[in-house]
UniProtKB/Swiss-Prot annotation:
PANTHER family: 30S RIBOSOMAL PROTEIN S13/40S RIBOSOMAL PROTEIN S18 (PTHR10871), SMALL RIBOSOMAL SUBUNIT PROTEIN US13M (PTHR10871:SF1). The lineage of its organism: Bacteria, Pseudomonadati, Thermodesulfobacteriota, Desulfovibrionia, Desulfovibrionales. One of its GO terms (molecular function) is rRNA binding. Belongs to the universal ribosomal protein uS13 family. This is Small ribosomal subunit protein uS13. It comes from the Bacteria. Keywords: Ribonucleoprotein, Ribosomal protein, RNA-binding, rRNA-binding, tRNA-binding. Located at the top of the head of the 30S subunit, it contacts several helices of the 16S rRNA. In the 70S ribosome it contacts the 23S rRNA (bridge B1a) and protein L5 of the 50S subunit (bridge B1b), connecting the 2 subunits; these bridges are implicated in subunit movement. Contacts the tRNAs in the A and P-sites. GO terms for biological process: translation. One of its GO terms (cellular component) is cytosol. InterPro entries: Rbsml_uS13_C, Ribosomal_uS13, Ribosomal_uS13-like_H2TH, Ribosomal_uS13_bac-type, Ribosomal_uS13_CS. Residues 95-122 are annotated as: Disordered. Transmembrane segments: none annotated. It comes from Nitratidesulfovibrio vulgaris (strain ATCC 29579 / DSM 644 / CCUG 34227 / NCIMB 8303 / VKM B-1760 / Hildenborough). Part of the 30S ribosomal subunit. Forms a loose heterodimer with protein S19. Forms two bridges to the 50S subunit in the 70S ribosome.
Length: 122
């Protein structure tokens, strides 16, 4: 089983699909990586030899930010927004939509479950 960036790639899948199991690599990036390394994207992970796996691993390490590094960078960016006190940072801090969506109705995913109103029972 090929292990790249701390992720075990699934054995029976095509290489381009298997690379998307790595956080930060989608289909387009996977195809770019395979073009750069010269590996045919229609091959299965089982069919790759050690040299090809090492080429892919080297390409990802040198030119792409994936897994832990990418997660750390994203959380640092959000923390920076919260620290400087900008509008986007305040929205992150309050757990509300950041990009201008309406919140009078909708936005339930971001706001969490509804709090029931405590009212007079008839």
């Amino acid at each position: 089983m090929a292990r790249i960036a701390g992720v075990d790639l699934p054995r029976g899948k095509r290489v381009d699909i298997a690379l998307t199991y790595i956080y930060g690599i989608g289909r387009a990036t996977a195809l770019q990586i395979l073009d750069a390394t010269g590996v045919n994207w229609t091959r299965n992970v089982d069919d790759l030899n050690a040299d090809e796996v090492n080429e892919i691993r080297k390409e990802i390490e040198q030119n792409h930010k994936v897994e832990g590094d990418l997660r750390r960078e994203i959380s640092a960016n959000i923390k920076r927004l919260m620290d400087i006190g900008c509008y986007r940072g305040l929205r992150h801090r309050r757990g509300l939509p950041v990009r201008g969506q309406r919140t009078h109705t909708n936005a339930r995913t971001r706001k969490g479950p509804r709090r029931g109103t405590v009212g007079k029972k008839k």
